[in-house]
Amino acid sequence: MNQQKSTFIFILTLGILSMLPPFGVDMYLPSFLEIAKDLDVSPEQVQHTLTSFAYGMAFGQLFWGPFGDSFGRKPIILLGVIVGALTALVLTEINSVGNFTALRFVQGFFGAAPVVLSGALLRDLFSKDQLSKVMSTITLVFMLAPLVAPIIGGYIVKFFHWHAIFYVISLVGLLAAALVFFIIPETHKKENRIPLRLNIIARNFLLLWKQKEVLGYMFAASFSFGGLFAFVTAGSIVYIGIYGVPVDQFGYFFMMNIVTMIFASFLNSRFVTKVGAETMLRIALAIQFLSGMWLILTALLDLGFWPMAIGVAFFVGPNPVISSNAMASALERCPQMAGTANSLIGSVRFAVGAIMGSLVASMKMDTAAPMLFTMGACVVISVLAYYFLTSRNLKSRG
């Protein structure tokens, strides 16, 4: 019983760690207009603070993986969580959007450490079958963050100052750091640690870039995520600023998208062993493609809020299915470099998301069209990358 209890607390701690990035992103979405007013800038400039966080996550995923292999998992995870929490506190004292954007990059960069190294820590401890079960549990905990964070953020903005959002983010981060310190063991033994050799790291990344199929899956997942991040970047301005959704109600509309993601993930877990990752990936891409075309149509015909909101939910829903199955298919083709591939794909995924978010943020948001066209374009690129870069062996993989 004690062993079961300690395992539960261990998994719960990792689940809380996995919640930190979505808390850092989703909780302050309802506050964009308030931040813009407070800093005397346009809402579009505030959007760049979100894409800056994503750029930090992209670079951090390349950086922290090798450091964790060299210096151990626990100290790097602690460093990332503590710096992220302290950065959230500093953000409450910032009165310049430029400094705010720079600090969000720092927060994303250090926030990547627990994301990358939690997975490595799990691989140190669990067998393949156990790992799958543990990851399913952690995913359920992770899904709570984007489900509740925008709702919490909306009520905080309604009743308090937007600074309070970052106090909460900092408090959650410090709580996570305490849990890591007292509960998480160091799993990467000193005799297994790998010295930092940049030439070997660079060589492995280059080898992956030369594998056509790996690129196909990577870009399929990355541009699917890019479409999602275009919505995350601009969604609050579109819903609140353009369609007049009350700030404290935005989280409930955002929740609709998370529910479709959870439902899609559930269906994937039920059927992927029966029909295969490749089939589930194709189905998810097809649903997202049709949803993307519908969103473009709603923009062209100005169909209003609900047709757009429902289309967004169906667009966002397949994203975890695309991501998980594309990742599994890519790693299957480079098992000897699975860690490097995981780091590279995660980095490219956030980089594409940041670029798409920056693209949307650079456009004038008088209507929802810039966001919707960007989402539609992303899924087109995703489908084309999958079709042209992985098509040679589709028949043999069935």
Swiss-Prot record:
Its main location: membrane. One of its GO terms (biological process) is response to antibiotic. The keyword Cell membrane applies. It is found in: Cell inner membrane. One of its GO terms (cellular component) is plasma membrane. Involved in sulfonamide (sulfathiazole) and bicyclomycin resistance. Probable membrane translocase. This is Bicyclomycin resistance protein homolog. The gene is bcr.
